[in-house]
A protein has these predicted regions:
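Contiguous, often N-terminal, cationic amphipathic patches that form binding interfaces
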Residues: 1-71
Length: 71
């Protein structure tokens, strides 16, 4: 299944909210950097209850959404 995230970096507090079928808002207090996708995979694993190895970063679309494949 595909999971789509709208991510706001540098937020005042961290939160994870569902807003549709396989769509989530993720607010992170740290800035975006080259290892952001690895951090997000760990958060998704914890929040969705899925093992780390079953979640893979797919792409970042042209609207800024982050797309992950969850097996």
């Amino acid at each position: 299944m595909k999971v789509i995230l709208k991510i706001r970096f540098n937020a005042s507090s961290e939160s994870f909210e569902k807003f549709g079928q396989n769509r989530y808002f993720l607010y992170l207090s740290n800035p975006e950097h080259e290892h952001s996708s690895q951090i997000i995979v760990k958060i998704l694993s914890r929040k969705l209850g899925v093992p780390l190895e079953k979640i893979n970063f797919a792409f970042k679309d042209n609207t800024g959404n982050w797309v992950f494949d969850v097996d």
